């Protein structure tokens, strides 16, 4: 029963949060992406540092890419973007609810569900957006970047370290947990994020180069706004859902496994 409620609550949260995220993206981020895409065919030459293994077939590959997305420039592209937002929100809602349940198990149920949802969502924002983006900020289409594998490895390192730091602060009781968290947060930047050698917009010149620089700056703030709105909405939705539908069966399960927790449950109610 608890598992079924978890799935349904995550789905409800995903539909609400994913819809809000889609609206924010359509309002602020998508226009920037579409504006940047108009400059892609003005790139004079690819940057050697980011050439793929199939560079010899780059021109044919680009034609296939353009053809594949031509039909998706309108409603179809919007539909799949919304589906992707809902699926991502579903996975994040599951994660938030599980961490909230872990909080209740480890720290009791005296803390209001909405407050726990805010703390967990803030940790999710720091782990999955803020800390990785400090080294690998979002880029507009047409921007050259460092090698994909190196970026993936560093992103994963940043997520693991920041997530571990949040878990240490949230669940550890030792007094030096702040030092451990600070050390974990510093690891990705001691290693160093992969950087591109040279100008990321080296293939562009004149007006295109200046326009893409401006769009890149706007896109940086747009992605941060979208991420903040996502996690803020997640907290606002997850708190009431957890309190109404997930906390009661969770308390019952905790009481069944540990009779001593009955006092904590009564205090929370």
Each predicted region: which residue ranges?
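N-terminal signal-anchor transmembrane alpha helix
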Residues: 8-32
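Individual transmembrane alpha-helix segments
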Residues: 59-91
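Hydrophobic alpha-helical transmembrane segments of integral membrane proteins
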Residues: 104-140, 195-204, 263-269
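Hydrophobic alpha-helical transmembrane segments
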Residues: 84-100, 157-162
């Amino acid at each position: 029963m608890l598992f079924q409620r978890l799935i349904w609550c995550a789905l409800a949260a995903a539909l609400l949060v994913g819809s809000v995220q889609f609206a924010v993206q359509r309002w602020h981020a998508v226009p920037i992406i579409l504006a940047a895409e108009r400059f892609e065919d003005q790139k004079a030459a690819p940057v050697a540092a980011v050439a793929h293994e199939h560079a010899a077939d780059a021109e044919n590959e680009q034609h296939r890419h353009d053809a594949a997305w031509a039909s998706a420039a309108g409603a179809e592209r919007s539909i799949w973007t919304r589906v992707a937002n809902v699926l991502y929100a579903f996975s994040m809602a599951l994660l938030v609810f599980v961490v909230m349940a872990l909080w209740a198990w480890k720290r009791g149920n005296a803390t209001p569900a909405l407050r726990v949802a805010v703390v967990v969502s803030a940790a999710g924002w720091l782990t999955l957006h803020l800390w990785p983006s400090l080294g690998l900020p979002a880029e507009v289409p047409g921007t050259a970047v460092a090698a994909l594998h190196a970026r993936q490895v560093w992103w994963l390192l940043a997520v693991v370290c920041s997530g571990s730091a949040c878990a240490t602060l949230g669940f550890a009781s030792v007094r030096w947990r702040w030092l451990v968290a600070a050390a974990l947060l510093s690891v990705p930047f001691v290693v160093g994020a992969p950087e591109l050698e040279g100008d990321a917009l080296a293939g562009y010149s004149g007006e295109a180069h200046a326009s893409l620089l401006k769009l890149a700056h706007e896109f940086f703030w747009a992605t941060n706004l979208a991420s903040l709105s996502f996690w803020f909405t997640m907290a606002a939705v997850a708190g009431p859902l957890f309190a109404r539908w997930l906390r009661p069966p969770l308390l019952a399960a905790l009481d069944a496994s540990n009779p001593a927790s009955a006092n904590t449950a009564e205090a929370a109610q």
